[in-house]
Regions:
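Conserved short alpha-helical segments that host acidic/polar catalytic motifs at enzyme active sites
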Residues: 1-210
Length: 210
């Protein structure tokens, strides 16, 4: 058996049914958010210094936001993150709108199909909200977006940092999670462009491809 260590906590939930299903079965479309909270609380004893959540809407239309993130620092970071989200609901929407899963799916943040949670335990000595996962890499092309959280500590940061520079990038911070995000993003960009080119040769139109 491996020894017990202080590690980051990670949660991921992928819904296979629409929000209306959870509204009908559990009385609220926010059921996956409640599960996310519970699963993060069960990992709280890992000594986290901060917490963050992210959500992706898989069926958003152009002009609609589809990636959301909330982060906080401190021992009460988990309830703070969720309370901030719920207070936003109460401030910006009516009770009828909040209880309508179809309205929420289109208009409300954190009403999506993919949820991610992270509890940060620092192994590098660096702290601050900028180091709390999930990390986001945003792009107007949906296929090029990334949300990343992990439990790792790279020992070859200088080498990975220099690889990014050699690729022509200009890293904006020195952090292993950021390096990994940009390396993955670089490869994702290349792959999306490769597949896009193949689809164009097959006669498909831009929006049809994406």
């Amino acid at each position: 058996m491996e020894p017990l260590n202080h590690d980051c906590g990670i949660v991921m939930i992928r819904l296979l049914k629409p929000l209306s299903y959870y509204q009908q079965k559990y009385g609220t479309w926010q059921y996956p958010m409640h599960k996310l909270y519970l699963m993060m609380e069960k990992q709280k004893n890992r000594g986290q210094e901060g917490a963050g959540i992210a959500c992706v809407k898989m069926h958003a239309e152009p002009g609609e936001e589809y990636m959301f993130r909330e982060r906080a620092l401190g021992s009460s970071a988990i309830p703070e993150v969720f309370n901030t989200t719920y207070k936003g609901y109460a401030k910006n929407y009516t009770r009828e709108q909040i209880n309508d899963p179809d309205f929420a799916a289109v208009n409300m943040p954190f009403a999506g199909e993919l949820y991610m949670g992270h509890l940060r335990y620092s192994t590098t000595g660096k702290s601050g909200i900028a180091y709390v996962h999930p990390f986001l890499r945003r792009n107007n092309w949906k296929a090029k977006n990334l949300a990343l959280c992990g439990n790792f500590s790279m020992i070859n940061n200088e080498e990975v940092y220099n690889e990014l520079i050699e690729k022509g990038q200009h890293p904006r911070r020195f952090a292993d999670s950021y390096f990994l995000l940009e390396h993955m993003g670089h490869r994702l960009d290349r792959e999306v462009e490769r597949v896009f080119g193949i689809a164009e040769l097959m006669g498909k139109k831009n929006r049809e491809i994406t």
